Regions:
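Long, contiguous binding/interaction regions
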Residues: 2-41, 48, 52-81
Length: 81
């Protein structure tokens, strides 16, 4: 199984990297860009687990290591390979 994990700054947290990217896009005349949030994308391959077990393990990994829950949110998708 493949878990696709997305980690992003919480809405209330200032995102200086996202702001810098948005400013650069504006300077390149992409005026339609309203906002950019910079995050992380991870792929975690799992074996030997049921779908339910995989969801539980990825949730645990995100809460314990992959995301800083004070300043980041996460979501994930589990895909069969």
């Amino acid at each position: 199984m493949l878990a696709k994990v997305y980690v992003t700054p919480k809405k209330a947290i200032l995102d200086p990297q996202g702001k810098a990217i948005a400013n650069s896009l504006h300077s390149l005349h992409y005026d339609e860009v309203a906002d950019v949030r910079m995050g992380k994308y991870l792929e975690v391959r799992l074996h030997g687990l049921s779908r339910n077990q995989a969801e539980q393990r990825i949730e645990e990994m995100c809460r314990r290591l992959l995301a800083n829950l004070v300043i980041e949110d996460f979501r994930f998708e589990i895909m069969e390979e």
